[in-house]
Amino acid sequence: MTEVVAVPVRLRPSATAGVRLPELVAQVGAVLADGPGQAATVPDIPVTGVTLRAQEVLSGDLFAALAGASTHGARYAGVALERGAVAVLTDVAGVAELTAQASSVPILIHPEPRSVLGGLAAAAYGHPSNRMTVVGITGTSGKTTTTYMVEAGLRAGGRVVGLVGTIGIRIDGADIPSFLTTPEAPALQAMLAAMVERGVETVVMEVSSHALSLGRVEGTQFAVAGFTNLSRDHLDFHPDMEEYFEAKAVLFDPHSLLRARTVVVCIDDDAGRATAARAGDAITVSALGQPASWRATDIRSPGVGAQEFTAVDPAGVQHRVGIRLPGRYNVANCLVALAILDVVGVSPEQASLGFRDIRIPGRLERIDCGQDFLALVDYAHKPGALHSVLTALLQPDHRLAVVFGAGGERDPGKRAPMGEIAAELADLVVVTDDNPRGEDPAAIRRDILTGTVAAGGAAQVVEIGDRRAAIQYAVAWAGPDDVVLVAGKGHETGQRGAAETCPFDDRVELARALQVRDARLLPAPGRACQ
């Protein structure tokens, strides 16, 4: 069983030499605020940490007071000072929010303080990414799977590994829960420093477009970056697909300060080919027969949920590889992982040993309660991912059911396409709720159903808002050798409504439905989140 460790207030090193405040000020071009109590010059004091959460300040920290969605962080400067902050970094608007108490420490002003946080934190923690090998994985889908594969290969090769991603943080196999794909810049640098302290040699992390756009990985030196694919997602954050692509491209662009020393790119879509062309010297991979540095041939599936293929490396040497994941897209993810592992000195043979028993929470995760059909949970929550996973699960003479919804307060333009994809590929489509947040769940379902109507076809389409009841319906429908997929939430353990997040785990609910299925004693639907 995987070890679960206690979560500290914030994962950070037990000790750090820190950096002098004048050095930090000079590094980022901040200016000292005028006003009562402020010195004429920046005082020569040590800064041993950086945080933007007042409640997490430790003595010696610089507190970054940033503008938030509803309030300015400067309002909490008093809390930060009480906890031992030695300086405050903010913007002009933040200065106006500061109380008189804040005049007891240096107040630094920068027009865009968030943009310099990564560099400040990296300096305060001794530039931890320079003391280890950091691998970054980006792309719309496959980031989590690829990072887990790289981690598994590294551990099989005897390395001490850190992992940072959507599911959580891992240090040498021990799990630490997380809530962001990529943590905020100060937390990330503190985390990397703590990993150095614990003997981690290589860190593999998911790098989201949000993280790249918001500067969360500034101050990080990437040894290797991997690109999986690009399809529609996050258009509630990015104005269009072009900006979404550009956000991810900075890890590969030779003119970018964040560009990794070595880059690995899957060229099985247009975005991958454009990324490789921009990089100029990318190690390329293809699972679709494209000319590439690493290629997959002789792909075979001994059964639903497993594949074997031959990976042909840049020297033309063939390596037989097996993975317990279906779909050509997972062959592509595996090739990206193999190429990255080769760069950092892990052979395909060593990597394959790590892949053999890999289990990725909520990524085509099997739920087996002795039933005579296949039941799976997956994180697919966007059109491209849903298409890929449903295509991977299609088998002659086996019916396919999918239960899914779409998140509220997120890109509404992907709802109808997801409905159309589901109705085109599955035999049973159960449209349900998935983190409606502040939106009307029924309206979200209507958007999805518009797509199922557009698909036409013979799929049976059912609308059941209560997610528990929707899962139970699909389980009751399934017969021998059928496939039931519950998509969208994957590893998540809550259903987000407008006012609360209710405990809800698709894996638990699917197992529960399977356990009572034979007795036909399906319980009444539970309370929906409000």
Swiss-Prot record:
Subcellular location: Cytoplasm
Record keyword Cytoplasm present: yes
Binding site for UDP-N-acetyl-alpha-D-muramoyl-L-alanyl-D-glutamate: L52, T181, T182, S208, R216
Pathway stated in the Swiss-Prot or TrEMBL entry: Cell wall biogenesis; peptidoglycan biosynthesis
UniProt-recorded Gene Ontology molecular function terms: ATP binding; magnesium ion binding; UDP-N-acetylmuramoylalanyl-D-glutamate-2,6-diaminopimelate ligase activity
Post-translational events: Carboxylation is probably crucial for Mg(2+) binding and, consequently, for the gamma-phosphate positioning of ATP.
UniProt-listed InterPro entries: Mur-like_cat_sf (IPR036565), Mur_ligase_C (IPR004101), Mur_ligase_C_dom_sf (IPR036615), Mur_ligase_cen (IPR013221), Mur_ligase_N (IPR000713), MurE/MurF_N (IPR035911), UDP-N-AcMur-Glu-dNH2Pim_ligase (IPR005761)
Coiled coil region boundaries: none
Membrane-spanning parts: none
Pfam families: Mur_ligase, Mur_ligase_C, Mur_ligase_M
Recorded catalytic activity of this chain's protein: UDP-N-acetyl-alpha-D-muramoyl-L-alanyl-D-glutamate + meso-2,6-diaminopimelate + ATP = UDP-N-acetyl-alpha-D-muramoyl-L-alanyl-gamma-D-glutamyl-meso-2,6-diaminopimelate + ADP + phosphate + H(+)
Record key words, sorted: ATP-binding, Cell cycle, Cell division, Cell shape, Cell wall biogenesis/degradation, Cytoplasm, Ligase, Magnesium, Nucleotide-binding, Peptidoglycan synthesis
GO annotation (BP), single: cell wall organization
Requisite cofactors: Mg(2+)
Gene Ontology cellular component terms for the protein in this record: cytoplasm
Meso-diaminopimelate recognition motif, short sequence motif: residues: 434-437
Keyword Cell division: yes
N6-carboxylysine carried by residues: K248
EC assignment: 6.3.2.13
Binding-site residues, ATP: G139, T140, S141, G142, K143, T144, T145
Major place of residence: cytoplasm
Family: Belongs to the MurCDEF family. MurE subfamily.
Protein name in the entry: UDP-N-acetylmuramoyl-L-alanyl-D-glutamate--2,6-diaminopimelate ligase
Organism listed in the record: Mycobacterium leprae (strain TN)
Annotated gene: murE
